[in-house]
Amino acid sequence: MNYFMPLRNIWNRVREFPRASTTASGITWMSRYIYGYHRLMLEDLAPGAPATERWPLYRQPSPHFLIGYQYLVRTCNDYIFDTRAYSRLKYTELVRPGHQTVNWSVMANCSYTINTGAYHRFVDFDDFQATLTQVQQAILAERVVAELALVQPMRGFGITRMHGRAGEEEVPVERLMQDYYKDLARCQDDAWGMAHRLRIQQAGPKDLVLLATIRRLKTAYFNFITSSIVSPSQEGEGEERENPDRASSRPRPQETVLSLPCDCDWLDAFVERFSDPVDLETIRSLRGVPTGQLIKCIISAVSLPNGEPPSHHFREMRGGVFTLRPRENGRAVTETMRRRRGEVIERFIDRLPVRRRRRRVPPPPAAPPEEEEMLVEEEEIEEEILGAFEREVRTTIAELIRLLEEELTVSARNSQFFNFAVNFYEAMERLEALGDVSEMPLRRWIMYFFVTEHIATTLNYLFQRLCNYAVFTRHVELNLAQVVMRARDPVGAVVYSRVWNEAGMNAFSQLIGRISNDLAATVERAGRGDLQEEEIEQFMAEIAYQDNSGDVQEILRQAAVNDTEIDSVELSFRFKLTGPVAFTQRRQIQDVNRRVVAHASLLRAQYQNLPARGADVPLPAMPPGPEPPLPPGARPRHRF
């Protein structure tokens, strides 16, 4: 670049270049027929490099440089895409007083295929209906473990690159792992949680501590709201109904009792008591519990810090191992927790082994004595509200997680790509409420969850590399993003095709929101056949259909299809980027370009073919005409 001497604005320097080198149409012609910029920009263009030998560079760099183009191609090459294509390389010029620039734009199309046809471990049994509830809860259990388990990044690799498949050079370990997760049959127990694993693996030391803490908080809350389900006190519920006196006199096991607030820092005791990792055995012990209640617990925990459940959820989800003293020092316990919430959260964060980068906001002033008296009266009423304590616990945990997410770096903070699971749990909750959990919806739920996790992981990767890298986004802009999903049968024929489009710099994050909502809503249509006329409009509203998002008939075909026919799903990610074209100020490069353009124009006028790049063609002579003006401060050149 130092030798190239890049120039962006050529407003008062146009006469230094050949006419074809300064206009969008001229650069398009040069890029396509002379230099082949779509490939040349990927070469080493240092003076004298092998790529610059002979026609048309003659040991000089190219007269233009497409800023960001090489990084775009490298970003796509570093991922697990099976195919990559770059088309519609175009140039546009912007001319206004004092400003004349040229931009390049390209459409990238990258795709890969995932094997979704293997459901044997999940749902293929001789008597499926007899084991439906067990299968459903087993699937939920494995998924919840993937959501809440304290996942650690990969360790133990002495090198970060390993030998790939036949014919490949060494590839990053992360790429091999992502390729491994493309097959639902092969990855088996590791089918779930791919997006979370990759998020942890890409985190820095500070982010790793924060993400692990957030995961512990969600795990603790999930264990808290399910503790009443596995509580030993539940074993004697039948006896309590028959003999209330015996129930009141029977003490609860001491190891399951924890009084709150035991001190001001109740959060530490809460996390210490409940943050044991969620494992399959714990979830399987809940099989006697209605699936609908289990799903409510899952949604409440996974959706943290967003989406406070309705009040009736707290009546159904009660922590069973906390003994709540109704009053402490004349004040309601729940109100005490609410008053001290900010202080407890700040102390918890300050104890973490990370340096905080956000200035602490001073706490609000204490309430006057008159207000305290009024609040005490309100507390007595508030304590009677069923579920108030559970609601306060969730509110505190949610606020703590929200503050921890603000401490994350920008790359680790973008959690919108990892919230897709909530849509699928809510779809399962609706099916459970309707009593419509059968083989077909469960098959579709598994397949679409697996596909959505792949889409979320890929969109997050593209977002981090193309939209969240400041050096790149300072120059290159994302204009359009599109995801195409093609379901194929065992012989490769397309069963249905779906398209989602979004525009702007936030296109990737908007896409995952639309896709997860769309596919989760389609789960409920599994096994119902074709939609009736009166159902189509409602279904389109549920999936938030937008114009230019694919054929409506394809959407209806997807809803009605039998998912056992689908063997694989091809995912195509298309995105259009626009970046700047830099011009050279080096006189030697300009002279070579002037000679090459004049010679190519002469050959074209004579209807002759242009030489291929690297052809052994002597350097053409300088075309006749007036000497181009010198750049400011340049010395006159003597010709011999």
UniProtKB/Swiss-Prot annotation:
Residue numbers marked as site, Cleavage: F157, G158, G320, V321
Biological process, per Gene Ontology: DNA replication; viral DNA strand displacement replication
Superkingdom of origin organism: Viruses
Keywords from the named record: Covalent protein-DNA linkage, DNA replication, DNA-binding, Host nucleus, Phosphoprotein, Viral DNA replication
Bias (Pro residues): 620-634
Short motif Nuclear localization signal, span: 351-360
GO CC aspect terms: host cell nuclear matrix
Residues the record lists as O-(5'-phospho-DNA)-serine modifications: S549
Region Disordered: start-end pairs: 232-257, 614-640
UniProt signal peptide: none
Positions marked as site (Priming of strand displacement replication by covalently linking the first nucleotide of the new DNA chain): S549
Coiled coil: none
Molecular-function GO terms, alphabetical: double-stranded DNA binding; single-stranded DNA binding
Subcellular location, record wording: Host nucleus matrix
Record-linked InterPro entries: Adeno_preterminal (IPR003391)
Entry PTM: Preterminal protein is used to replicate viral genome, upon genomic encapsidation it is processed first into iTP and finally into TP by adenovirus protease.
Keyword Acetylation attributed: no
Subunit field text: Heterodimer with the polymerase; this heterodimer binds to bp 9 to 18 of the genome. Interacts with host POU2F1; POU2F1 binds to the auxiliary sequences in the inverted terminal repeats and tethers the pTP-POL heterodimer to the origin DNA thereby participating in the assembly of the pre-initiation complex (POL-TP-DBP-NFIA-POU2F1).
Biological role: Protein covalently bound to the viral DNA that acts as a primer for viral genomic replication by DNA strand displacement. Assembles on the viral origin of replication in an initiation complex with viral polymerase, DBP, host NFIA and host POU2F1/OCT1. The terminal protein stimulates the template activity over 20 fold compared to protein-free templates. Neo-synthesized viral genomes are linked to two preterminal proteins, one for each 5' end.
Family named by the database record: Belongs to the adenoviridae terminal protein family.
UniProt xrefs under HAMAP family: ADV_TERM (MF_04061)
Descriptive protein name: Preterminal protein
Organism: Human adenovirus B serotype 7 (HAdV-7)
Lineage: Viruses, Varidnaviria, Bamfordvirae, Preplasmiviricota, Tectiliviricetes
